[in-house]
Amino acid sequence: MTQDQLLAGLKKDVRSLLVSSKHGLTPEHLRRDYQSMLGFPMPLRLLGFRNVLDMVKEMPEVVRLEYQLDGNIILKAIGDDTTKGIEELVSKQRDHKPKPNNRKGKPGYFNISYPRLQPVILPRRGQAKPALPAHLRSQLKQLLSHGPVRLSELESRYVAQFGKPLNVTQYGFFSISEMLSAAMDFIIMQQSRTGSQLLLRSAVTPQNQPENLMRRFSMQSTSPKQRLAGFSPKASSLPERRPEVSLDPSSVSKPEPVKEEQSFEETVFKLEEELRQQILEKGTAGTVSQELKEKLRKVVAENGNGISIHNLPTEYQRMHGEELPVSQCGFLSVTEMVGALSDTLAIQRGTDESESHWMVVEFKPIDTQPCEPELSPGDGTTSSPTGELQNPSSRAFYFSCPESAWEHEETEPLTDSQESDAELRVANKTIHQMVNLFPELMVSRVSAVPLDAVRCQKLKPPVHRKERELLPVLVEQTESPSYFYIRFSQNKEARALENMMIEMRSCYSYPDVAERYRLPDAYVRPGQVCCVAPRDMWFYRVVIHEVFSETEVKVYYVDYGDITKVERHSLRFLKACYADLPAQAVPAMLAGVRPITNIWPASAVSCFQRLCCERTLVAGVHSYQEDFLLLFLCDTNTEEDVYVHLALIQEGHAQPCSAAYGLVSEKFNPVTSYFGYDQLEDVKESLSPFSCSPDAEIDSQGNDSPSSCRTASNSESGETNLASIDVDPNLDLPPLEVINVPDVNTAAKSENVNPFEALVRKDPLFNSEWDQGWTAEDKTDETKFELDVSTEQSKPETVYTPSPVQAAVGKQQLCASPVEPKVNATTCVNPHNPVPIQINCSYPVLPGVPVYPVKPPISQFMMQLLGNPVYQGPGPNTAFQHLTSPLALRPAARMSAGGQILHWS
């Protein structure tokens, strides 16, 4: 019987039981009636339900829930067309009434009967009424301090104030009226035209007192200017009195600004004290009156070394002739009461060795310490302000706090940048204009990989289980009964996986975080740990299985066992905190069976998937064979347990064999390939772009080095060098690519020459050569230029000195006939053994490591286009002076040519 058939039969039986009950059944009664009528318990576990209420949630068309006055749940049936007649008969049934107890008494005995109501069952307690807890007293005081509250609005106002319902039963009260009767010492009830109102018995400090304190504090903080200007009316009306005031010795000995500065710190200290008192009054300490606090302080003060907490009630009764009102104030013990009075009393450990001996002492703030003698106020005018300023500062928390790191301002970098700006203004015109021309196209020496990213580490392998252990598992990916992946469920690791996926989704969903953790091309390699979101929703931990193409890679899902293709740009670095959890997908084999032939047929695989997938199974661990888990699978969701290996044998898809049968060596094993505690090979980190500051150029001038930014990577020393480039500031150049051209030296430049004059010509001579020059093979042959920059007084012109390129373009490549483009001579090597590729014969770069260009370098060809060419090669070089059509240009060149390209014919 399938689960759907079992659930349909259960719905029919439950409806029949509930329809026959006129007033419904409780969940427990329904369970007992089901077992007594059918003879077996309800199949809750077989259908995946934990209790009857979980089953009811899945049957909204059969059962409805009702709540009684005492909070019990009653289940009633929802009838259909087949149960209308039975419902009418059940509704006409008479309710069962208990027989009255008719006692025959003596003559004159009258039996008086009263209507009996069903009592509400509530938790019972002793005879004494409970005391109001201290925190509830404090909350009620805060609620009523805003003003009177109507009795009908007490619960709603309490929820709005504190964010939780007023549940008086958890404090031992039967009703709100009983709770209010216990709070009659500070709450009174008055009748008004709108109904009963609750208000405080005694006056309470208004809630806007802190605002008054802040207003008074602001007035006092601004008072020095007003007091200093107090003499201004007299001074304005009587200007001749100014010398008298300045010559008066009494006014000179007591300057007003120092006095007002002292009052500022005193005001801060008083403000903190008043705020602290307000906080204490809002807490549990506010439930104790000041009179009781003073009495307790006197009892403790009589004993210089403190009094034992066990003797405090006795001493209090001996001194004041009354018992200590602990329960009346809402406290359960003397220790709780003394702990709440932190502004008056303190608890310390006793001097003896007993740990349970506590002493109650009078509270003395630690901060109020006497000042040092040299800082104490004296008779002179110099020492008096210092001593008066130190004492409030030592007591006030505002002045004792250390300076925060966020408030610390570093002035040295600002000074350096200001000096650099000053030096830049004195520098020559070329450097100043280069900074403005390329403001954000330089390279930083800071790593582009986040510090908490998993770079070369491997994930932890799945946890090994003990033999003969029974575990709940989920079959995730199936290839055959001899090769599939399982994942353990209903354990701590499964819950950790769910929480981790939720955290990963919330983390990587931010665009800035996703862009920062984007996986560079250098790290796209087999075995690299990363994460990916296939449908842009949930992120999964993956390991790169194979680099399929330039845009796609195959990844292995370490927690689910799938291998799929994903886009290369969707890969992200995995944060280190998400690598602590071991891989959850375990490669497994079904023990005890083998295929009838050498391979498993498609019918056997589909049967195995039907028996295992989309349900929780019980796995019996047999053993491990080369990190493959050999196990038995059992389906306990049906009435009878179904063993998967026996079901395959019965249906004729397999034959029995020894439990250890399997060809593990021929299968892909991710545990040995991708997991472990070793690491992959280190990758030369690429550099992230940043704005080249003028400081770097000024420093390079001071060191007699070219003012340039270096972008070629050195694999041996790890340093970074960039080719120096100088650009005419009057040109707005588009980003152009690099091609191989012969050595050309530019001797002079003319500002009046159109830089794209050669591009707009229509002479059809250089069609194939143009296409060959812009191919992707020539992108690595970049030209290195060095720029000697000096002041305008020493060198009025800037001269390019290009270094020789790696390979010059021959005449055969420049012919007009369509020939095969010449590919750079490279040797095919094993990708696992990287060989340095020479770029410009001086910068070896490993294959696969990207070199990020700073800005488009200017090739010899572009230098010839941008200036007056002086060709030094053997013979005329006419190939670079003609172009077949403007449509052969790249989009950037066509945009730079502007409107002149429209006049070509």
UniProtKB/Swiss-Prot annotation:
Residues 6-79, 128-204, 288-364 form the HTH OST-type domain. Residues 219-264, 368-393, 694-728 are annotated as: Disordered. PROSITE patterns: HTH_OST (PS51644), TUDOR (PS50304). It is found in: Cytoplasm. It comes from the Eukaryota. Residues 379-393, 700-723 have a biased composition (Polar residues). Residues 523-581 form the Tudor domain. Belongs to the TDRD5 family. This is Tudor domain-containing protein 5. It comes from Danio rerio (Zebrafish). The lineage of its organism: Eukaryota, Metazoa, Chordata, Craniata, Vertebrata.
